[in-house]
Regions:
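Residues forming the flavin
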Residues: 1-414, 463-466, 477, 482-498, ...
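C-terminal auxiliary extensions adjacent to catalytic cores
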Residues: 390-446
Length: 549
């Protein structure tokens, strides 16, 4: 911790992140005891500003938390009406019938939602119960007690100059202390990353795996719109270059969510995930749907894909990791929000019981037991082998092997046991000389768009006078190692055009970080083959401003 003197505020529970996990925890705590002092700190300009998800929501988490959510006006307005799955070739598609799919793949009873709007509604429910929610409050540091337990966080520091010195409007922020601190920052949160390393919470676990999810909202011709229709695809354009797939969700008001996910364990450093997404929209099936329509929003976010075997230990003295800070996405279902909500509820119940017993700043072991042995663990354990089988054997073989494994897991066993993930996504990156460059067609400005134009539809903004929140452990590595060895992959894997290599006045290569473009996806922190880029929080309120993602 720095030597800066700060004011302090005391709470029973301090929650970092107003996503589905953090808000569920806050709501459940106040349901259990209205007198508990609970605060939620959100780095976005408002609740929902940094929320990006598909999303087809399994309402089981909401059912458990707020059983009368329908009566209370939760924005779950579009039930899934039909479910389609296609294998794509470059010029055609093959529909996979639903009947051989394991039952867990069925979307009956689920809803197409904007998770940003769901979180905004959840925040209203939390505030009605007396939860304090502070948006625009980036949490930049953990606060530790003398015994090594987590004591709280530093939030609200802003006004630094670009060199890190205090500017004329500098505010040091505050220390918010709690009997327990919940980290619900989403995927690859900077504080969760620190806590996992400090307490060695990943010891004995498989490496976490990730995907990069990119999403656009389109307004399309009403004649083509089918409210409640859900489509997923695999195959082209990724084929054998990488794992991943797409989603097309028809919500209301003639709007469609069009998204594309690239698994970040791809080997070819020439691969350009954003351009794979843009190319996907030119497939005849997709182009026919979108032609004549208008893209109205864009965003990107990393997704945790490691599943059951990659979940770290979730508790340390005084702190618990919730939701995607742990990694609770069911990869074949492409769903994690329900588990995030259930994790928040479980953490709240464990903390409430501890506080009732007069405890504080210890390990909430009951929470971890609930997650691993309860509904979340059951959901993730059944599908634990799908991602590693895909990585090891490719798309076609893994569809058969993974499908078979999911079927046997519904009966309580697996012939595969638990398959290892192997390398981290950064370690999986191959050398440029060992892989062929990939030629991507130029965006046409109608169906496909250049990256910087699309980033403007994320409404991202960062105060330019502050220190860059994207830092390098060694400033020489991008040019001395990553460029000659991997052809500078950051200039391609970033979906916002943050990184580029330019020539300086002497004609030498120079690495440039355009941090103002950042949409907080965290891909650079994950995929950089040298693990040299570190994502930290900018000052509060900065970043994307997603309206309905």
């Amino acid at each position: 911790m720095s030597d800066t003197t700060r004011e302090t505020m005391e709470y029973d529970v301090v929650i970092v992140g107003a996503g589905p996990a953090g808000l569920s925890a806050a709501i459940r705590l106040k349901q259990l005891d209205a007198d508990l002092e609970v605060v939620v700190l959100e780095k976005g300009s408002e609740v929902g500003a940094h929320i990006l998800s598909g999303a087809v929501l399994d309402p089981c988490g909401l059912d458990a938390l707020i059983p009368d959510w329908k009566e209370k006006g939760a924005p779950l307005n579009v039930p899934v009406k039909d479910d389609n799955f296609y294998m794509l070739g470059e010029a055609g598609q093959l529909r996979i019938p639903n009947f051989p799919m394991p039952p867990l793949m069925n979307n009956h009873g689920n809803y197409i939602v904007s998770m940003g709007n769901v979180c905004r509604w959840m925040a209203e429910q939390a505030e009605e119960l007396g939860v304090e929610i502070f948006p625009g409050m980036a949490c930049s540091e953990m606060v530790y007690a003398e015994d090594g337990s987590v004591k709280g966080v530093v939030a609200g520091e802003f006004g630094k100059n670009a060199d890190g010195t205090p500017g004329p409007a500098y505010e040091p922020g505050m220390e918010l202390h709690g009997k327990y601190v919940f980290l619900s920052e989403g995927v690859r949160g900077s504080l969760a990353k620190e806590v996992i390393a400090k307490y060695d919470l990943s010891a004995g676990k498989e490496p976490q795996k990730f995907g990069l999810g990119m999403k656009e909202i389109w307004e399309i011709d009403p004649a083509k719109h089918k409210e409640g229709s859900v489509t997923h695809t695999m195959g082209w354009p990724l084929n054998f270059n990488a794992g991943g797939g797409s989603f097309i969700y028809h919500l209301d008001n003639n709007q469609v969510y069009v998204g594309f996910v690239v698994h970040l364990n791809y080997e070819n450093p020439h691969l350009y995930p954003y351009m794979e997404f843009q190319r996907f929209k030119h497939h005849p099936m997709v182009a026919k749907l979108l032609e004549g329509g208008k893209r109205v929003a864009y965003g990107a976010r990393a997704i945790s894909e490691g599943g059951y075997q990659s979940m770290p230990k979730m508790v340390a003295p005084g702190v618990a990791l919730l939701g995607c800070s742990v990694g609770m996405v069911n990869v074949p279902r492409i769903k994690g929000n329900h588990n995030a909500m259930l994790s928040g509820k479980a953490a709240a119940e464990a903390a409430h019981a501890a506080i009732q017993d007069g405890r504080a700043s210890d390990e909430l072991t009951a929470y971890e037991t609930d997650v691993r042995e309860g509904a979340i663990g059951e959901d993730l354990k059944k599908v634990r082998n799908v991602k590693p089988l895909w990585s090891k054997y490719g798309l076609t073989a893994s569809l058969m092997l993974g499908g078979f494994d999911m079927w046997t897991n519904t009966m309580g066993f697996s012939l595969f046991g638990t398959v290892s993930h192997g390398k981290s996504d950064a370690e999986a990156t191959g050398k440029a000389a060992d892989h062929k460059p990939i030629d991507y067609p130029k965006p046409d400005g109608k169906l496909s768009f250049d990256r910087l134009t699309n980033v403007s539809f994320a409404a991202t903004n960062h105060e330019e006078s502050q220190p860059a929140h994207l830092t390098l452990k060694d400033a020489s590595i991008p040019v001395s190692i990553n460029l000659p060895t991997y052809d500078g992959p950051s200039q391609r894997y970033c979906p916002a055009g943050v990184y580029e290599f330019v020539k300086d006045e002497s004609g030498d290569d120079k690495f440039v970080i355009n941090f103002q473009n950042c949409v907080h996806c965290k891909t650079c922190d994950i995929k950089d083959p040298s693990q040299n880029i570190v994502w930290t929080v900018p000052q509060g309120g900065d970043g994307p401003n997603y309206p309905n993602m």
